[in-house]
Every structure is written in C-alpha cells, then in structure tokens.
Amino acid sequence: TSARRLTSAAADARMGGAKLPAMSSAGSGNHGLTAILPIWAIKDFIDHDRDTLLRAIGLSHIITAYVKAHTGRLSAVCGCSVAAGAGATAGITYLVGGDVRQVEGAIGNILEDLAGVICDGAKAGCAIKLNTAAGAAVQAALFSLHGVNVKDTDGIIGNSTRKTIQNMGDLSHNGMGQADKTILKIMLEKQLNKGKR
C-alpha cells in the first residue's frame, strides 16, 4: 500500500504541475517515479544496506531501459506499467534477497499482468496507472519470491525473460498499431469537440 500511495501521489503532483524535481528513467519522469519509488517504499519494511538499495534501483533503471528499447519510445502500451513496472519488480525482488530466477519470474508476472495497459497521453490520470503499476510490482515480486510464476505456456510469456520482453515489443509495435491510431483519433476528436461547446 505504501508503494502505491507514494508512487501515485508523486505522479499526481507531477502531472498537476508541482515544481519539484523528478529523476527520469528511459527519458520519462513518470517512468522514473515508477522505477524508483516502489523500491524506496519497500525499503522501510525490510533489512537492507545502502549499497543493496542503490543496486536495486540501478537494476530497475536497466530493466526499464531494456524493456523500453523493445516497446519503443512512443507506444500504445503504457511504459510506466510495462517497462518501469518490470524494472520496479526486478528491483524489489533483488532488494528483498531474490535470486536471478526469482527476478526473472517477477518480470514475467508483471508483464503478463499489465501487458494490455494502454498509453493515452501524459495527464493527471497517469497517477492511477502508476498506482496500479506500483502495486503490481510488489505483488509480482512477492509471488515470485514464493515460487508463484506465470509459465511459458501462458499468453505472451516466452521461454526466457528476453523472449518475453521481445514478445512485449512485438505486441507494442505490431499488435497495438490500430489501438494507437484509435487512441489518437479519440483524443483529437475530444479536442475538436471542446472548441464547439
């Protein structure tokens, strides 16, 4: 709950125009909030040292950038959910003491969970999506730490984390093309209709 509150409050403030700095990740401030703050919130509930915390945040940035490299900078898929969410769950799993297999399981869990979350532009409502991503990051990590992972027989999950992320990129580039056009059409129609009121 604290991860969700911290992350969504920061996004709400940022999208509301608060004049406060935010560290970006993969070129996005909201990605930065999602990649860092859930890990920061979790640290208060576990034993850890500063170096492990910093490595967890570093891992989150690396995974965020790696997923983003596959999904693309502009996509119909919400990068905060899938890219930064994957980074956050990897960082949380690492911080809590998870091994490589558990980090991979957590990434698969969150990508299966949030793969279909769309991006419909940067706005105040992003706080809700970041809330969801932060909660899902914690949940995916906890599931994996307890041996509960989505199998490669399910949906877009591949036989490796790399393949799962490649599948996510394929979904983003090839599967969501029409969704992207439809989202843009709806947003443009809203702008046109706003002037007619």
Positions of PLM-derived features:
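Conserved phosphate/anionic-ligand binding catalytic regions in large, soluble enzymes, centered on
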Residues: 19-37, 79-83
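Alpha-helix capping and helix-loop boundary segments enriched in small/acidic/polar residues
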Residues: 26, 30, 51, 72-80, ...
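Active-site-proximal catalytic alpha-helix in oxidoreductases
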Residues: 31, 77-90, 112-115, 132-135
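Helix-loop-helix junctions within the multi-pass membrane cores of secondary transporters/permeases
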Residues: 50-68, 72-73, 79-96, 100-103
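Glycine-rich, flexible beta-strand/loop modules in the N-terminal catalytic cores of phosphate-handling
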Residues: 1, 17-25, 43
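Functionally critical mobile loop/hinge segments
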Residues: 1-2, 92-197
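Acidic-glycine-rich active-site phosphate/pyrophosphate-binding loop
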Residues: 1-17, 50-69, 108-116
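Alpha-helical support elements that line or immediately flank enzyme active sites
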Residues: 32-48, 89-97
